[in-house]
From Swiss-Prot:
Function: FAD-linked oxidoreductase; part of the gene cluster that mediates the biosynthesis of fungal ergot alkaloid. DmaW catalyzes the first step of ergot alkaloid biosynthesis by condensing dimethylallyl diphosphate (DMAP) and tryptophan to form 4-dimethylallyl-L-tryptophan. The second step is catalyzed by the methyltransferase easF that methylates 4-dimethylallyl-L-tryptophan in the presence of S-adenosyl-L-methionine, resulting in the formation of 4-dimethylallyl-L-abrine.
Lineage, opening ranks: Eukaryota, Fungi, Dikarya, Ascomycota, Pezizomycotina
Protein name in the entry: FAD-linked oxidoreductase easE
The protein's annotated pathway: Alkaloid biosynthesis; ergot alkaloid biosynthesis
Gene (name only): easE
EC number in record: 1.-.-.-
Domain of life: Eukaryota
């Protein structure tokens, strides 16, 4: 509790939180917030560095206890008579690691991310959902959604799928969490938990060695480009173990392969030596009998005792697969000064992500034409001054470097975006999709009960979503996207 004489307020934490245990609890909480005109925020696991699940002077609905998991042999969506194949229904509080463990026991896996503590159907799914292992071969997480159960702004429980409330269903497939309603559960396609062989190529050099980027990172990006063309997905991770050193690792994921020797031979047949450039290199290989095991072993992106900030950019297939693509990208990324615990990594798009054009999603159309997502994770010092400095440096220095890789596009991922992104409407969704999202928001939540930072409709509120600006939402949104 705050002392009355204290000049330090509560901050961006909610004053009250309803830790819900059922859908009826959520309905009662939403109606309570609406009746009393409260600033409402939705928290799933809180795995969010941009403050979307918190706000000052607010009332929070915390969904972490909704832990139901139901497996379906042939899921039939409400209002339909057609089976959609194997699927699983996950409650709003189920985390990725829990879904992976349940799947491993029952012979399936979902399209999920690497961080085990991320909620499987919260902001990850509603924001798009990228998997370093599965997206190249399966698509985005939102490509797998068959049905949502949602508590709307008036407290009703709504089914959203291809046959019911199609506008809401579309908006929840990339329009962002905590914006259109409270998702209580989602049903997503499942896949067989097939084996994967993972090769790992690691390089390390002194931070002062400019050839680390020009030769080392360039070579790893060239390998990633080459193996993508061979239908093999991969992920590049760059970090600074100490203030005087840099390291990078490229993992290639050979789906449905259990022959270590074959994987290593393929890698070595394409790789070039780097030792002559003062760069140490090593290669290893491992076989996972179940792909979910690879995801379950990944560490969380959050370093202990620190907060983080994130920024991201899409790299188009045209840029990445150009002859000079790897060299260009390595050169641009070298402008980012990495400190200990900072991380720079790619997520493999292209492949099935590009092929799933028949599936309508709310994300920016450029996702279907992208080859990679590049994400920068900055560690934030535990002080007010440190946080402000890191945030301002991210916006003023880091993001322009990321956007310079593909300057004609400048598309970002809201789930991993700059918390101060000024052009979020066009960066995250594009003008046409944002206009459609704004119309859906107006239809389902005309009073803006649900509001998140840099979410659909947030431009007509102040930075914390407390005070509404004078202009109407539709008019303001239209002017911002040039309509």
């Amino acid at each position: 509790m705050e002392r009355r004489q204290s000049i330090c307020p509560q901050g961006r934490l909610p004053l009250y939180s309803a830790v819900v245990r059922s859908t009826s609890d959520i309905q009662a909480s939403v109606r309570f917030a609406s009746r009393h005109n409260l600033r409402l925020v939705i928290k799933n696991t809180g795995h969010d560095s941009a403050g979307r699940s918190s706000a000052p002077h607010s009332f929070q609905i915390h969904t972490s206890l909704l832990q139901n998991i139901s497996l379906h042999k042939n899921f039939i969506a409400r209002g339909s008579t057609t089976g959609r194949g194997p699927a699983v229904t996950l409650g709003a509080g189920v985390m990725q690691w829990q879904a992976y463990v349940h799947g491993a026991k029952n012979g399936y896996t979902i399209l999920g991310g690497e961080c085990p503590t991320v909620g499987a159907v919260g902001g990850f799914l509603q924001g798009g959902g990228v998997s370093s292992i599965h997206s190249f071969t399966r698509g985005l997480a939102v490509d797998q959604v068959l049905e949502y159960q949602v508590v709307s702004a008036n407290g009703d429980l709504i089914t959203a799928n291809e046959d019911n409330n199609q506008d809401l269903f579309w908006a929840l497939k990339g329009g962002g969490g905590g914006t259109f309603g409270v998702v209580t559960e989602a049903t997503v396609r499942v896949f067989s938990d097939d084996p994967v062989t993972v090769t790992s190529t690691k390089i390390e050099a002194a931070a002062a060695n400019v050839l680390f980027w020009k030769e080392g990172v360039h070579e790893l990006l060239r390998l990633l480009q080459r193996f993508n063309n061979l239908h093999v997905a991969g992920q590049l991770v760059i970090s600074a173990p100490t203030k005087d050193s840099l390291q990078a690792g490229l993992e290639l994921h050979f789906a449905n392969l259990t022959d270590e020797t074959q994987a290593i031979q393929l890698l070595r047949s394409e790789a070039r030596a780097l030792e002559t450039h003062g760069i140490s290199a090593s290669t290893s290989v491992r076989v996972q009998r179940k792909a979910s095991s690879e995801l379950r072993m990944k560490p969380d992106v959050y370093p202990p005792h620190y907060g983080i900030l994130e920024a991201s950019v899409l790299i188009s297939a045209a840029t990445f697969h150009a002859n000079d693509g790897p060299a260009l990208i390595a050169s641009k990324l070298s402008g980012l000064t990495l400190k200990p615990n900072d991380i720079l990594f790619t997520s493999n798009l292209g492949g099935r992500v590009s092929e799933n054009t028949a599936i309508e999603i709310a994300l920016h159309p450029a996702w279907r034409e992208a080859a990679q997502l590049v994400t920068l994770v900055r560690v934030v010092e535990p002080s007010i001054e440190g946080k402000l400095s890191a945030l301002n440096n991210l916006t003023a220095r880091d993001v322009p470097i990321l956007y310079s890789i593909d300057p004609a596009a400048k598309i970002s991922y809201r789930n991993l975006g700059d918390p101060q992104e000024k052009e979020f409407q066009t960066r995250y969704w594009g003008a046409d999709n944002y206009a459609r999202l704004a119309a859906t928001k107006a239809a389902w939540d005309p009073s803006h009960l649900f509001m998140t930072s840099l979410g659909v409709g947030s431009e007509v509120w102040d930075a914390e979503g407390i005070c509404r600006k004078r202009r109407g939402f539709r008019a303001k949104a239209s002017s911002l996207i040039g309509m």
